[in-house]
Every structure is written in C-alpha cells, then in structure tokens.
UniProtKB/Swiss-Prot annotation:
<dbReference type="InterPro" id="IPR020626">
    <property type="entry name" value="Asp_DH_prok"/>
</dbReference>
<dbReference type="InterPro" id="IPR002811">
    <property type="entry name" value="Asp_DH"/>
</dbReference>
<dbReference type="InterPro" id="IPR022487">
    <property type="entry name" value="Asp_DH_arc"/>
</dbReference>
<keyword id="KW-0662">Pyridine nucleotide biosynthesis</keyword>
<dbReference type="Pfam" id="PF01958">
    <property type="entry name" value="Asp_DH_C"/>
</dbReference>
<comment type="similarity">
    <text>Belongs to the L-aspartate dehydrogenase family.</text>
</comment>
<feature type="active site">
    <location>
        <position position="222"/>
    </location>
</feature>
<keyword id="KW-0520">NAD</keyword>
<dbReference type="InterPro" id="IPR011182">
    <property type="entry name" value="L-Asp_DH"/>
</dbReference>
<keyword id="KW-0521">NADP</keyword>
<dbReference type="Pfam" id="PF03447">
    <property type="entry name" value="NAD_binding_3"/>
</dbReference>
<dbReference type="GO" id="GO:0033735">
    <property type="term" value="F:aspartate dehydrogenase activity"/>
</dbReference>
<keyword id="KW-0560">Oxidoreductase</keyword>
<dbReference type="GO" id="GO:0016639">
    <property type="term" value="F:oxidoreductase activity, acting on the CH-NH2 group of donors, NAD or NADP as acceptor"/>
</dbReference>
<dbReference type="InterPro" id="IPR005106">
    <property type="entry name" value="Asp/hSer_DH_NAD-bd"/>
</dbReference>
<dbReference type="GO" id="GO:0050661">
    <property type="term" value="F:NADP binding"/>
</dbReference>
<feature type="binding site">
    <location>
        <position position="125"/>
    </location>
    <ligand>
        <name>NAD(+)</name>
    </ligand>
</feature>
Amino acid sequence: MKRIALLGCGSMGTQIALAIDSENFPATLTHVYDESKDASFSLTQKLKNKPEIVENSHLLSSQPIDIVVEAASQNAVKDVALSVIQNKKDLMIMSVGALLDESIYDILSDACNDFKKTIYLPSGAIAGLDGLKSVKDELESISITTTKHPRSLKGAKFFETSDINLDEITSSTVVYKGTAKEAVTLFPANINVAALLSLTGIGSEKTSVTIVADPNTDKNTHHIEASGKFGTMTFTIENVPDSNNPKTSRLAILSAIETLKKYCSDDIQIGT
C-alpha cells in the first residue's frame, strides 16, 4: 500500500486527507505538515488513522513515504519540490502556477530525470486536457475566460495596485486581460487552470487569460477556446466553489483525489 505525505492542511488538503482516510482508498496518509500547527492538529483530529505531524516542510521528504501531495501554495512548491525529488519521492503539485517560472520548471524536470521520479499535475478545475495534449504540436492559439464571484477573487495580489473595488461591482465586469504568465503571479490562488493550459499547450506567454468578476454567479466558470491545424476545441466548465474556500472549485479537489487513486492503483488506466 502506498504511503502519502501531505503538505498543506487547509481546505483542499483536508478534503484530500479525508478521502485517503476512507475505507476504500488504496493508500495510507502517514505524515502531514502545515505552517500552522493548529491546522495540522485540526486535520489529524478529523481522521480515523492519525498521521504524524512533522516539524518542518523539508522533513516530509525524508520520511518513509512514496509521494508528497502539495496543497499549500506556489511558494511551498518553490521551497520544497526539489528536495522531495532529490529524496527519491514522487510529488503531486496543486499550485501549478509555480511551474510557469521556467527556471523552476527546468530544475524540477532535470531532477525527475536524474532521480527517476515523477511529478503529477492533476487536471484540476477544467476538462479537456487529454484532448489538448493530443493536439499540442498543432496548437496555434488558446484562450481561457474565467468567471467568478468577486468574493472568490478577494486577496489577489492584482487588487493591491488596481483601482477596481470588488465590493462595488454590481454586474459582470472584466477585471483582467493578459497572459497566463502574468496572471499566475497576480492571481496565485485563483488561476491555476491557466497554468495547466500553458504547460499542456503553447506556453504561458501565448496563452490568453481573461478574468471576470460577476456578483450574480454562484459558480466558478472556465470557458476555453483552442484552435490550430487540427481544427477547433471549445469547452465550458461550470464548477461549484468549495464550501470552505470559494477560490477553489470542488472539481479541483476531486481531480486531485482521482489522480492519487490512479497513482496508487495497478488496474486499467483511462485517458491520454
């Protein structure tokens, strides 16, 4: 049975942990870490099988585990990812925006080759990545329009220097237009989907991102358009926001859980 360590005990990390702790999950959660010891302790109290709480993030990768699941932040990825691979552990990353820093991506890619380990990036809050992977060499353009309630965008770095006041928005309003590379730094907790599209497709500087704040929606909606020699693809995903963290879609959490199940299973695998 696979042994899993969890980095990040917030809303997403908690729900991943609860899934692993269920009777039908083919793995064991053995270690957890969060910057907040209270968050780590609170999580363990919800579990039947109590994982060990480690004292710092770098201790996770030195434990007798198979994979570290990151559900914390882009900074956590930058701080810990390399040591996980160097300690010959696999890694699943939810804060995918960190990988749009080309130096980090290249270092981690080289480390995976050197240490024969794998980094897993769940498809998160969008669908259609299998199709995009299949036509990657023929892609010419790709764009994503993300629509969320203003409260789901609060706290984003973008609004520190913007004149836009989210509390004053009364109708659907475009708050950002630009590249995925810029978007993941300005909206680090909101737009991991753009990072995934960039890594799957034609890169972060060629992936167009539009972010819309709509006080009349109760969904996190992603509309994706891609075109090239293969033809065109258009798909729209309307996600229910996580009840504890509206910045995150329920689908992103379910995607992480399913990716872990696939990692821990040796049965028939579906998809590209």
